[in-house]
Amino acid sequence: MKVVNHATKYERLKHFLNALNEPTYRYKQITEAIFKHRIGAFNKMTTLPKALRESLINEFGPSILTVEPVLETTSQQVTKVLLKVAGNNQVEAVRMHYEAGWESFCISSQCGCGLGCTFCSTGAIGLKQNLSADEMTDQLLYFYLKGHSLDSVSFMGMGEALANVRIFDALNVLVDRQLFALSPRRITVSTVGIIPNIQRMTSSFPQMNLTFSLHSPFHDQRSELMPINNKYPLDQVMNVLDQHIHETGRKVYIAYVMLRGVNDSEKHAEALVKRILNNRYPHLYHVNLIRYNPTVGTPENYGQTIEEKLQTFYRVVKSARIPVTIRSQFGREIDAACGQLYGQYQAKKR
C-alpha cells in the first residue's frame, strides 16, 4: 500500500499508521525511538509489534534515513560526509567540533546550485536538483543517530537555501517538539538575497538567524560576482533586511568572502560601512569576514587575501562601531570549509 506524497516522511508515517488503523500512540513510539533512543532501523524499534515493523520496512525501507553515506572524511575538528540522495545524486554535510564540546553542523539544501556565483565550488557544478525536506533534515539525523549533539545548525552547505521552497518544510521538522525539537535561535539560514523568501522567513520563522551573502558593496561588481544581483539588487535586499530586523528584533549577519585584489580594499570596506550605516538598525548588522577557500572547480584567478588587507578591512568596519568578526577556518584541508563543498562533481565549463 503506497501512501500519498506528503511533504515529509513524518507526515507520511502518520497517514500510513492511520490507514492501518493503528492506535494514535504508535506515531509517538516511533518518534521516541528515533529522537529519544537514537534508533534508525525499523526492525530495532522493539516497542512496536513485529507485524507493524515489517509493514514499515515494506513501505519505507529498512531505515528511517532517506540519505545513504558514501564517504566520510575527517580532520582535527571537522567531519565531512558525502551522502547519496534521490536520483543517484550526491551532497555533502559537515560537522564541526569545538574545544568547549559544542557541535555545529553545516547542511546542504540543493545538489549543486544554479545561481553561478563565480567564486564558489558548488556554483561551478550547476543545479542538479533541489533536496526534499527529508533529505535536508536527514543530513542532521545521520549525525544524531551516531550519537552527536545538535547544538547548532546552518544551511550553508551546497545550494542556495531560499531557492528551494522545501526548506520551509525542513525548518518545521527541525523545530517540531516531537521530532528534532531544536530552538529556532540555534538555526541559521544563509541566502544570497532571495527577497520573497526572506520575507517568508520574517513572517514564519522570526527567531531564526539570517545570514546575507553580500561579498561586494558595489552593485555592478556584485552582479559580476553574483548574477542573482541582477534579479534582486543589493539596494532592495538591504531594505528587506532592515524590515526583517524591524519586525523581528533579531540581528542579521553579513557574510563577506575576501577575494584578493577583487573586493578586499579599504574602498570596499568604507562602502560596506556606508551601506550598513544608512540603514535604520546599523548596530543589528554583524559582519563576518571569511577567508577565501579555493578548491576544485573554482577559477584560478581568485585567491585568498593577504592578512594585512584582512586586518585593515576589519579595522575599518570595527571603527564604525559595526559588530565584525573574522570567521575561524575549519576543514580547509579536506575541502570542508566555506565555499568548498562540491559533492565530488566535476565543475561545468563557465
From Swiss-Prot:
Keywords: 4Fe-4S, Antibiotic resistance, Cytoplasm, Disulfide bond, Iron, Iron-sulfur, Metal-binding, Methyltransferase, rRNA processing, S-adenosyl-L-methionine, Transferase. It is an enzyme of class 2 (transferase). Its cofactor is [4Fe-4S] cluster. One of its GO terms (molecular function) is metal ion binding. One of its GO terms (biological process) is rRNA base methylation. Disulfide bonds join C106-C338. GO terms for cellular component: cytoplasm. It is found in: Cytoplasm. S-adenosyl-L-methionine binds at G159, E160, S190, S213, L214, H215, N293. Residues 99-333 form the Radical SAM core domain. InterPro entries: Aldolase_TIM (IPR013785), Methyltransferase_A (IPR040072), RlmN_N (IPR048641), rRNA_lsu_MeTfrase_Cfr (IPR022881), rRNA_lsu_MTrfase_RlmN/Cfr (IPR004383), rSAM (IPR007197). Binds 1 [4Fe-4S] cluster. The cluster is coordinated with 3 cysteines and an exchangeable S-adenosyl-L-methionine. Its main location: cytoplasm. [4Fe-4S] cluster binds at C113, C117, C120. The keyword Transferase applies. Pfam families: Radical_SAM, RlmN_N. The active site is at E92 (proton acceptor), C338 (s-methylcysteine intermediate). Specifically methylates position 8 of adenine 2503 in 23S rRNA. Confers resistance to some classes of antibiotics. PANTHER family: 23S RRNA METHYLTRANSFERASE (PTHR30544), RADICAL SAM CORE DOMAIN-CONTAINING PROTEIN (PTHR30544:SF5). Reaction proceeds by a ping-pong mechanism involving intermediate methylation of a conserved cysteine residue. Belongs to the radical SAM superfamily. RlmN family. Cfr subfamily. This is Ribosomal RNA large subunit methyltransferase Cfr. The gene is cfr.
